A protein has these predicted regions:
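Catalytic core of the metallo-beta-lactamase
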Residues: 17-24, 30-39, 136-156
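Conserved phosphate-coordination/catalytic loops
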Residues: 61-64, 87, 151-154
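Generic recognition of flexible, low-complexity loop/linker segments
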Residues: 8-10, 23-24, 33, 93
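Metallo-beta-lactamase
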Residues: 1-22, 38-49, 110-155
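Histidine-centered divalent metal-coordination motifs
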Residues: 79, 83-90, 152
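Pre-active-site segment of Zn-dependent metallo-hydrolases
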Residues: 27-32, 39-82, 94-103, 107-111, ...
């Protein structure tokens, strides 16, 4: 029987000035959104969501992104940027923060409020939070970000 997720080959070193995009979930599925950007030996995580199981997953409550590819590099993470407060974008953040509890979190006021509630549910302490709004520009290590509004089914 073949494994549903075959082992991927090792990724070579990142060329100087190169940007690596590592999707850890949410690619080809609706849910479990998590993308890591690697640049100059630093990492930026965008979203950290869960996937809700289907009927052929009895007894499974949540499906998390695979933290394995970055687990030994969590000290290189500049921040976790949350695009909005839906569970498929923030639901796995408490599990990531159990691995490294001081990762700065960036998001809108509403998104960070929803995350705070989730952290209390998991009995985790608050981490450094940076509230951003549409039009804001910030730098996180070597990463420059600009926040733009999009139409979606959440008011933020």
């Amino acid at each position: 029987m073949s494994h549903p997720h075959p082992e991927l080959p090792e990724v070579g070193p990142l060329p100087e000035g190169g940007l690596r995009v590592i999707p850890l979930g949410g690619l080809g599925e609706i849910g479990r959104n998590m993308t890591v950007f690697e640049y100059a030996d630093r990492l930026l995580i965008v979203d950290c969501g869960v996937l809700f199981p289907e009927e052929h997953h009895p007894g499974v409550d949540l499906i998390l992104p695979d933290f394995g590819p970055i687990r030994d590099r969590l000290d290189a993470v500049e921040a976790l940027v949350l695009t909005h407060g839906h569970e498929d974008h923030i639901g796995a953040a408490p599990y990531l923060l159990r691995e490294r509890g001081d990762i700065p979190i960036v998001g809108s006021e509403l998104t960070l409020g929803l995350l705070s509630s989730k952290l209390r549910e998991h009995r985790l302490r608050e981490t450094v939070r940076h509230v951003v709004a549409e039009g804001d520009r910030i730098s996180l290590g070597p990463f420059d970000l600009e926040f733009v509004a999009v139409n979606h089914s959440i008011p933020d």
